[in-house]
């Protein structure tokens, strides 16, 4: 317990007081632009459903604004924590992630919405445990890659441990069920292990096995099989199985080049289900047109590119933990954004994943804010390390996190 409390303290002295002028403000402004645009679009997309459910058309806008404020405060707090604290706290976070995934499955604890038990009610907010667990698992895996870096390329046991951890996490996610998050988590793990030096043939074999397992899960579930077959031709059943996707495509088509205007969407008027959450991107395309779509895609592309560059800079500065953490978080956020937009446009089957930073939801917004604050912290420490003379390697060969 003493170790946990020591790790959780806000050690401003160790973080160097945080020189704000050294932060990557281009990345920070990109994040704020996405979150700000998301807030506007949530307010627009949720007007009808909010008025019908609560009598206040701006109900979800107010809540999302509060979530955004909490996310900003949590991000600032994380910026003051050194990466070494997260490196040492990786095992604790791993236990926390599994604890949350188990607790939500206990009858009477987890809240069921649309047939899925993914939330724990906490008063004003429903905690989506998968969002917290995913960040915890990525932090743990980044630390594991540092500790076992020399063994990952050639040792099967070093590769098997994270495989077992993430497979168990995927099983718990599928029990909710949350197929989309399980897919993103496993893809992130494979990508990070590859970047950490795991052999390509092991990654390839595991990828094929996971693809086979995913296929069996789809074939064995009538609901998932219907989603797969519907996505190939949603117009074959536009009023039942293909209803959501066809309404999304109609929204995107109505937007044309410059959109119908902010607030003027027709599809959000109870035609398009989940217009303010999973399918917010469709409403954005309808109201802001291709121009708005290009802007959002460009912002996410820059975020993903910059995240990978930060990881590379951290590795060059002899900060491997920061590098793996940056890569893992970037892959996770970038992949989720890509899947959400692809699903909205009918390029992938429906997964139930939100658009990071933009879709309505407190857990997703807060945890994404924390993840991006960690990315900024990686860049901050890499810049500090690059400006300092490198110490001589110790005889023990211990890798600095």
Swiss-Prot record:
Family note: Belongs to the SEDS family. FtsW subfamily.
Record GO cellular component, one term: cell division site
Top-rank taxon: Bacteria
EC number, as in UniProt: 2.4.99.28
Organism: Alkalilimnicola ehrlichii (strain ATCC BAA-1101 / DSM 17681 / MLHE-1)
Protein name: Probable peptidoglycan glycosyltransferase FtsW
UniProt keyword terms in alphabetical order: Cell cycle, Cell division, Cell inner membrane, Cell membrane, Cell shape, Cell wall biogenesis/degradation, Glycosyltransferase, Membrane, Peptidoglycan synthesis, Transferase, Transmembrane, Transmembrane helix
Cytoplasmic compartment spans: 1-26, 87-88, 140-154, 202, 300-322, 376-401
Membrane topology term: Multi-pass membrane protein
Pathway: Cell wall biogenesis; peptidoglycan biosynthesis
Lineage summary: Bacteria, Pseudomonadati, Pseudomonadota, Gammaproteobacteria, Chromatiales
């Amino acid at each position: 317990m003493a170790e946990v409390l020591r790790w959780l303290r806000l050690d401003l002295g160790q973080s160097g007081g945080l020189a704000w002028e050294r932060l990557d403000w281009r990345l920070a402004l990109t994040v704020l632009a996405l979150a700000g645009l998301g807030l506007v679009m949530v307010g627009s997309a949720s007007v009808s459903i909010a008025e019908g459910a609560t009598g206040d058309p701006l109900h979800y806008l107010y809540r999302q604004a509060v979530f955004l404020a909490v996310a900003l405060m949590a991000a600032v707090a994380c910026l003051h924590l050194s990466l070494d604290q997260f490196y040492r706290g990786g095992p604790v976070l791993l236990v926390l992630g599994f604890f949350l995934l188990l607790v939500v499955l206990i009858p009477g604890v987890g809240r069921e919405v649309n047939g899925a038990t993914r939330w724990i009610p906490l008063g004003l907010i429903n905690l989506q445990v998968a969002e917290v667990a995913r960040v915890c698992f990525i932090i743990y895996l980044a630390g594991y890659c540092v500790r076992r870096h020399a063994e990952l390329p050639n040792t099967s046991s070093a590769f098997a441990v994270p495989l077992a951890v993430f497979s168990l996490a995927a099983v718990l996610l599928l029990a909710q069920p949350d197929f989309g998050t399980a897919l993103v988590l496993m893809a992130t793990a494979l990508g990070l292990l590859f970047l950490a030096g795991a052999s390509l043939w092991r990654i390839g074999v595991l990828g094929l096995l996971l693809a086979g397992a995913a296929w069996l899960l789809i074939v064995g579930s009538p609901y998932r099989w219907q989603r797969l077959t519907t996505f190939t031709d949603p117009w074959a059943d536009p009023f039942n199985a293909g209803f959501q996707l066809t309404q999304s495509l109609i929204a995107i088509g109505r937007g044309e080049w410059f959109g119908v205007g902010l607030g003027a969407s027709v599809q959000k008027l109870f035609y398009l289900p989940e217009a303010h959450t999973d399918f917010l991107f469709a409403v954005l395309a309808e109201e802001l047109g291709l121009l708005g779509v290009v802007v959002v895609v460009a912002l996410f592309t820059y975020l993903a590119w910059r995240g990978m560059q930060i990881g590379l800079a951290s590795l060059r500065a002899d900060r491997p933990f920061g590098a793996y953490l940056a890569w893992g978080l970037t892959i996770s956020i970038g992949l989720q954004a890509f899947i959400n937009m692809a699903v909205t446009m009918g390029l992938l089957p429906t997964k139930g994943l939100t658009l990071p930073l933009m879709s309505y939801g407190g857990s997703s917004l807060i945890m994404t804010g924390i993840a991006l604050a960690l990315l900024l912290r990686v860049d901050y420490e890499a810049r500090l390390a690059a400006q300092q003379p490198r110490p001589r390697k110790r005889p023990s060969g211990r890798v600095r996190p």
